[in-house]
Amino acid sequence: MSCLNLHVPKNPVGKYIPLVVLLQMYIIYVEPYYGLHYFESVRQFLGPKILYGTVYFLVICHSIESAIAFLLCLKKGLPFCSSMKWIVSTFIFGGPTLAMLNKQKKHIA
């Protein structure tokens, strides 16, 4: 079961960032599809290009950070399960997890 535990940044604010991203995804994709209008003013104020652009930008940035985490795991010689935890955690939380991985010593899972 230890293979399923993710490496979470120690910064408590970093734990809530995925919730903000999920709220943004809800505002962009789910709410208009079901005809709900709770966040209509936010969509009108920011516009669809900015909302879609930030999602695409974040996905690209986190993908690049995950690729860097993959290379760091290869360089450190970490086992597959531990490497996958670091890569998924870096994709979700971004830079703070990548900084934690960079500080880890060689062969530490």
From Swiss-Prot:
Pfam family, one: TMEM254
UniProt keyword Lyase present: no
Transmembrane stretches, start-end: 16-36, 54-74, 80-100
Keywords: Membrane, Transmembrane, Transmembrane helix
Recorded coiled-coil stretches: none
Superkingdom of source: Eukaryota
Topological relation to the membrane, as annotated: Multi-pass membrane protein
GO cellular component, one term: membrane
Chief subcellular location: membrane
Localization (cell): Membrane
PANTHER family per record: TRANSMEMBRANE PROTEIN 254
Protein name per UniProt: Uncharacterized membrane protein C688.16
